[in-house]
Regions:
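Non-catalytic cell-wall polysaccharide-engagement segments
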Residues: 87-217
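Conserved beta-strand and immediately adjacent loop positions that scaffold enzyme active sites
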Residues: 23, 65, 182
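Export/targeting segments at the very N-terminus of extracytoplasmic proteins
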Residues: 1-33
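Extracellular structured ligand-interaction cores
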Residues: 20-24, 75-78, 108, 137
Length: 217
């Protein structure tokens, strides 16, 4: 599943552009949006993650071993699910649907089902009402994903990922928490018009300076 497909899937679930970007920004931080990603796997092509997923799917790694992070387990998937009950939900849903636990669609489906659970209703409410990317991203970090590191640097980086994704898929520039855009993009015609306006202002300023210096006596 490409990032665009994840975007469209979440949008089809009713999430706004802002909420979708916040979710995907956190996925980017957690797993680089790779659904088979196993925590700590930096091998080429995520080879270790692929092998681990195959063992889970085949039953060589049992359900209990998967959900309790052993052997060689840990955070897994798009959101790096780690807590046993949440991994159990993902595993059981994949089994129910007859697909791999590393399947992108099943993971996004599980994510949305989790957000509708009573425990995460406060998170869902923010995602459904806020138009602030930083606010949506922060609530996902602090109340949904709950990584060990929730420092300002982490929060800022995840919000940055979210704004980049928003700009890529929503077709417009995302806003910072203070309401100011990251950058302002203008067309060549707009740029030339601004230059002409600036020249006029400078010209008028020169005229005023000359008039001030003119001796009317």
């Amino acid at each position: 599943m490409s990032k665009k497909t994840i975007w469209e899937y979440l949008k089809a679930k009713g999430f706004s552009n802002v909420a979708t970007a916040a979710v995907m920004g956190n996925m980017e931080a957690e797993s680089n949006c790779i659904s088979q990603r196993l925590q700590g796997d930096f091998t080429s092509g995520c080879r270790k993650s692929v092998e681990y997923t195959e063992k889970v799917d085949s039953g060589e790694i049992t359900r209990d071993q998967f959900i309790f992070n052993g052997p060689g387990g840990g955070g897994y998937g798009l959101c790096q699910w780690t807590f046993w009950s949440r991994k159990a939900g993902l595993y059981d849903l994949a089994q129910e649907q007859g697909v791999s636990v590393g399947d992108e669609f099943i993971q996004v489906e599980w994510l949305t089902r989790e957000l509708w659970q009573a425990e995460f209703q406060p998170v869902l409410k923010v995602l459904q009402t806020s138009q602030n990317i930083r606010e949506c991203s922060d609530v996902l970090v602090k109340q949904f994903l709950r990584p060990a590191d929730q420092s300002e640097a982490v929060l800022a980086q995840r919000a940055k990922y979210a704004r980049e994704i928003y700009s890529e898929f929503a077709g417009e520039q995302a806003e910072d928490p203070d309401g100011m855009p990251d950058t302002v993009e203008v067309s060549e015609a707009e740029y030339q018009a601004m230059n002409r306006a600036l020249l006029v202002v400078m010209y008028l300023k020169d005229i005023l300076n000359m008039l001030e210096e003119f001796d009317y006596d």
